[in-house]
Amino acid sequence: RLHESARDERRARLAEAFRADELLEQREGMVADEIAATRNAGRKAVTPGTVDLDRIVEAQRYEMALRAQKNLLGQQRKAVGGEIERRREAVLAANREVRALEKLRERHKQRYQQDETRRAIRELDEVALRTTRQGDD
């Protein structure tokens, strides 16, 4: 049971890592959408006639900041991906350990049942032998 609870704990930690990856993926998608929206707004701002350079420069700076944020999120997702793999390996190892212990427990149970059956047969043989001897006397 201790090994099963350790395995369950490892599964929970793996699920946490998956949730962290999902959150990072969502944030990365939101940043990508914001980058696209900023580009579209920048294109619309550049129309024939008047050009607002301050607005264009500000939009470019904002887009650069968003790209940096997206890169950071990508690095974080890569790190979380490595952690997911480590936790997945830990879960697999815990599963193997639990299965091995279950097999061992089953073998011990079978061995015990076989020993009990042999004992019962021996007792029955002794009773039959005594009965036969008493009948011969």
Question: Which positions does each model-derived feature cover?
Answer:
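Charge-rich amphipathic alpha-helical interaction elements
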Residues: 1-137
